[in-house]
Amino acid sequence: MIESDSDTSDDAPQEYVSASANIPAQFELATAHMKATPEPQPTQQPDAEALHDDDPLTTTQDHPTGPSATASDTIDSTPQPMAPATLSASAVLPSLPSDTAALLETFSQQLQQSNVKCQLKFRPIGGATPSLKQSVYKIAETQQFGVVVKFLRKQLKIKNSQSSQIFCYISSFAPGLDETVGSLYNRYAIRGELTISYCLNQAFG
């Protein structure tokens, strides 16, 4: 038993020495392996342009896929020419100028007067003077007295010549051919009628 103990004691140090002797060899092997293995190099990032070329998620701003921008797509700061103003868009005056207002007032009065009719009654003088089928007529007051004479001559079928004349009177005087019927009516009308006497020969001076 003692011998076995001694044998065991002799063998144990040998195994311990052998195990401890193997440690440096393994360490040297690991160190040699680390030296043989190249160090990893940092991964190089691709360029941004190359990424854009192959990246399907790029936006149209980074990598436009459509046609290039045209002049119509650009923002133009040049002001557009103004269109001519239409009549509906023209300014509305709050009041007319004094001269224009007076002119319109005069025209309005003349227009109203042109629609006013004066009643005339024709009365023949002398036995040889023909009478009209109808003795009462109406005429616009803006007409001249020469229109009345022309109308009477046409109704009586009297030619305008030296041998055949017609004389027209209001009361006892012969009005001028350029006088207006309205003026004569306002001065000499009786009971709403302006009586015009006529004859083929001169009756009053």
From Swiss-Prot:
It is a peripheral membrane protein. GO terms for molecular function: protein tag activity. There is a cross-link at G205 (Glycyl lysine isopeptide (Gly-Lys) (interchain with K-112 in ATG5)). One of its GO terms (cellular component) is phagophore assembly site membrane. Pfam families: APG12 (PF04110). Keywords: Autophagy, Isopeptide bond, Membrane, Protein transport, Transport, Ubl conjugation pathway. It comes from the Eukaryota. Its main location: membrane. The keyword Transport applies. InterPro entries: Atg12, Ubiquitin-like_domsf. Belongs to the ATG12 family. Forms a conjugate with ATG5. This is Ubiquitin-like protein ATG12. It comes from Yarrowia lipolytica (strain CLIB 122 / E 150) (Yeast).
